Amino acid sequence: MVTNINQLNLNKLYTYADYLLWQFSERIELLRGKIFKMSPAPNMRHQSISGRLFGELYVAFRDKKCRLFSAPFDVRLPQKGKADEQIYTVLQPDICVVCDPEKLDSRGCL
């Protein structure tokens, strides 16, 4: 079990399957298998803008089939297959709009 990001080889490529095993407090994203550290907590201005934008989007999509999510929310971008071992990109956008319910599962968006 990996409990600290310093236990990982940052030159190695990782998958979503690896990501699910990590239990450290640092926020990260995977981009083509590479680990990218996210800022620990967005500043107040960022949160204020993000909150206002989420509110506007909520109103715009209220009567549509689209659903809105805010971070932390895993967005997995598969290239070859949908198995956890085949996914090398996992992002956590501030706001995510998903209009295809087939892309949602208990772990986020695929």
Range-by-range predicted roles:
Residues M1-L110:
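Gly/Pro/Ser/Thr-rich low-complexity, intrinsically disordered segments predominantly at protein N-termini
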